[in-house]
Structures are given as structure tokens and as C-alpha cells.
């Protein structure tokens, strides 16, 4: 087929679209059931593949297996079909996902097992996705873009993704202006509200390559990637999503040749929100997926968060592998970058953190901490194997301090327990203090890390 069953639809329940069907849409907005649902969808399953292609997409692309625009609740709905959107040259804003391209309602008890992918040579400007302005391509296992206003609020609960989620640009050096941030996430590409008790098992893959393999530093081409969500860049106020009780077990592989500005990659969330004191929190989340960074990208990568945000009782067990990239990149078992007084409490940083090329900071808890006042880190545990990086910007708790002037205290009420190894040296009670933090910008009395040996 080439068109949805309906343009707009009310309540639909107990429906299966069989795998013998296939859809090749001719319009840039598509969902098998409808362009938009204004009534609830319940117990609807799609098994059919959707393939959308063009030489170039000049208009916004919104494609979900069931609906393009989810404007009412979606419950117990499932997709096993592959969703493929391809532009031979360029595309602008795009929302590609396993259930709904855009969601301004509650989605719960839903799943995706299909491969979800969007690819183009380069991004040629931005588009409006329903009511979200200046959008870039976003790909999500279940949802690509979220909406949030007085008419409806994005929320995703008890959902699972098992399919590969893929975002590819093959010629980013063809862009002529800064590109808004592209998102890719196992559950949601660009969230705009709470995500609760969701689980990702599929690979999250992003490739933003230049045509000749060289670093592109003239224009921005940023990617935000996370096992659960890319993050809140397009959310209301750029800070809307609490992520609670979620797990990622899928590998996250990011290749990029964009080196002008920081991309952000996290096992749970890439970019938690704007770089300020935040009101949202990533809580009770676990990452078990390995994260691999390559290309010439400038990146902040961490097992739970790539960029800065609040974290409570989160754990990373996956390996962070920096194969190659820009020397200004930072990586950490828990988070790549942390700043603005956001809090990290009762979190656990396990796994391996490996830099196979030069980085600006490598840490167990935090790769790089900003020059902003902090009092946090209470009850945290670090048991990492750290390899690579320079001694001056490497540490079990903090790799690099960005400045010398702001008071930073970690583990004041409950010291941080540290163990593991650094550059092949096993940490013990006699030597742990030598490996707690890097020396760059460290200022005694201003920077205080209360740590003890132990697990």
C-alpha cells in the first residue's frame, strides 16, 4: 500500500496488520493506521515493513509504524516490521519510529522488534514536526519526537525495544550551515516528558561520516544518542524528561567526523537537558550495553549520561571504548561531562573505560567536571578498569577539573568507595589516593574528594 487506512482515526483496538502486507508511502507523513490518532489505540500489532524513499526530502518526514502523529493514548501496541526512510541526497527534519513518529499522549506496554532506520547524505536545514520547531532527523525505537503542552503530554511507560535503531549521514561535509542536533534512542529519539520502566535491548547506531573521512570542523553536525533517549534538546525549556527505572542492554555505536561541537552519548541518555541547574533526574537506571566511539568526533560519552544532569541510584556496567575521535573529547563510566551543581547520589560506576586515542578527560565517575560549585557524590561506588588517557587528566572519581576557582566537594556525608585498576595498576588501600583524580587544575582546599578504598 501507499496510503494509511485513515487520515484521522478515533478508537482502534484488537487489530493485526500481517507480514504479507508491505507499504511504500508516497507522502512524507505516514502511519499504517492513520496520519494521526485522536482516539486510543489498544492492542494493535503491525508486522508489515514500511519503506519510504526519495532523492531528497524537502518537507518534514513523520513516519511511525502505526501512526505518524500520536495525539491520544497508545496501549499494548506492537511492531515487528522494519521501518526504513532513505534520502539519496538530503533531508530536513524527520521523525522515524517503531510505533509513533510524534507522540503527545501516553504510550504504555508497547514494544518494537523491527529495525528502525533513517539515512541521507546530509541534512539540509530544519523542519517543524507537528508543533516542535527547527527539527533535525530523529530516530527512536518507539517514538521519535515528543510534544508537551496544555493539550497533551508526552509520557512513555513499560515499553520495550529489541530492534536496531539507526541514524546515518554519509556526507556531512556537504552541509552549508550548522545542523540542529540529530537524535537517536532505543525508546525515544527526542523525549519531551517522563520515561518510566522502559527497557532497550537493540543496538543504537549513529554514523555521521564525511565523504572523504576527514574531520568536519566548519559547521556543526551534532548527534545525541542514548540507550533510552537522545535527550531533551527539543523538549519544552530543554528540560522535561525524568527517566526512572529504565535499563539498556543494547550496544551503542557512534561514528562521527564532526569535530566542531560536542556530541553526547550515554547508556541511558545522551543529553539530559540544557547546561544549567536541572529539575529533572535520571533515577534507578542501569546500563549494561557497551558504548563505542569512533571517527574524528568531539564527544562527551558516559555509561549513564553523556552530558550533565542529575543522577540518583544509577549504575553503569558497560564498557566505554573511545577508539578514535577529537582530542577534546571526554569519557567516563558514569558520565562524560558533569557541571552546574547537578547531583550524583548513590551511583555505581563499574565496567571498563578505555581510551585508545587522546582524550581531554577520562574518569570512573566523571570524565570532566565543569568549573561550577558542587557538593555531591555521596554514597557512590567506583570499581572500574581505566586504560588510556594522560595521567594529569585521569582519575577514578574525576578525570579533569575544568577550572580552579569553584568549590567542588564530593562524598562529604558518605565517602566514595574506590577500587579497580588504572593503567594496569591494581588499586589497594595503600595507593588509592594517588588515582582518585587528575592533577590538571586541581586546587587543594577548593577541590575536596572524600574517598576510601573498598567496594
Regions found by a protein language model. Name each.
Residues 2-455:
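Surface-exposed loop/turn motifs in large extracellular/passenger domains
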